[in-house]
Amino acid sequence: MVRELTHFIGGKHTPGASGTYGDVYDPNTGRVQARVPLAGRSETEAAIADAAEAQVEWGEWNPQRRARVLLRFLQLVEKEKDSLARLLSSEHGKTVADAHGDLARGLDVVEFAAGVPHLLKGEFSDNAGAGIDVHSLRRPLGVVAGITPFNFPAMIPLWKAAPALACGNAFILKPSERDPSVPLRLAELFLEAGLPPGVLNVVNGGKEAVDTLLEDPRVKALGFVGSTPIAAHIYATAAAHGKRAQCFGGAKNHMIVMPDADLDQAVDALIGAGYGSAGERCMAISVAVPVGEETADALVAKLTERIAGLRIGRSDDPDADFGPLVGRDAVDRVRGYVDLGVEEGAELVVDGRDFTLEGHEDGFFAGASLFDRVTPEMRIYQEEIFGPVVSVVRAADYEEALRLPSEHQYGNGVALFTRDGDIARDFTRRVETGMVGVNVPIPVPVAYHTFGGWKRSGFGDLNQHGPDAIRFYTRTKTVTSRWPASGIRDGASFTIPTMG
């Protein structure tokens, strides 16, 4: 039976009114399991109006009261995390264990945002001038919005919504129409936790909904995670309409493996970071850079052996290392890139194009592929594949290995495996990426640090979660005061005031 999904506006499930729907698939079988309404302009404007009205009161709640809502939300999610993980897995295709991780990393940011009474403390300067004190306030923006991707249907919405709500904003979430059920359930749980109706609205939709959020002057800021072309477009359009924007695009994350590295440790890291979640992660390691031919030969041999032992299965198979991709188009894209790599002259060591899961021939499965002797001019190196494909680019020495991620158009994350502290320190200072891991395969920062890439991986000067999130979702007001007012007896002054 195909489920009928809704929007979530004003604390209620709202049926679609546009007459346009998208299909939500079961990636394991390729069959449609739900229909999701795609909002038009009028529905999106209604959600904005509702949020603007609700935000007035919410923004005046004291920070500790808002934080208590987040803490109650954490308790509610904890009680049903197993069912949420299964629901997430059934629509996305990642394993249930991986879905638990998706939820957990999102909840980390909710915990961070619950510290908002401390995070919103302003600055104070006593007696900055004769009887003058200066202090700053952080005030909410009003209505803000988030456009989030299919690959983390719990984590990314929570990364954006939790700090925004904690700071006193109303939040409109436009999740991916591929797997919208978990975002809708999270909105219900926020309501149960005490969030006033309308402070968090969920609008499913496509371009028309996004354009409305970008153009409506009541929306003051917008966050996006997705492909680089769309990130660049949304950033430019938001700026043209006077909005703040933080937009995160594609990635081509490298792992540098030095000759002195623990090779078994590096292979373990690369197998998980390259093929986990079928490679559908913005922090996936898609490029391995062994330094020296001996290191490269040993790395490729060990990787080939490990790939042969990978178990690809249904997303609810507890023994599966990874499950299906999110859609048929994703499978076709991955196979197309493997075809392209062969045409470009890369050595295809492991070919996963023809993989099928017995009994699930219509499922969206792709096997693990491994290329060796990839070179920087190849498109399979330059472009994000977003699937279970790892490319090995051999570097003659450390300096060549350092140049590869530094000169790439994307600058999201990079990992270095070495036992040499001097090399590690030099690398972390010089490499041109926003996030760096040393003997850490997926360098996703903890919630109280910021997450974001450089170059064409990120647009905007403030990143996700951590202190940057608080700055992004607030504006600063600086107050200069002197008391009592009757103490001003010097008469009019026509020169700029100084504090001397």
Regions found by a protein language model. Name each.
Residues 30, 66, 88, 110, ...:
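Residue-level signal for inorganic ion chemistry
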Residues 229-375, 404, 438, 485-489, ...:
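ALDH superfamily catalytic-core signature
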Residues 31-120, 131:
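Glycine-rich loop-to-alpha-helix module at the N-terminal edge of alpha/beta enzyme cores
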Residues 29-35, 219, 256, 304-306, ...:
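Conserved C-terminal structural/oligomerization subdomain of aldehyde/semialdehyde dehydrogenase
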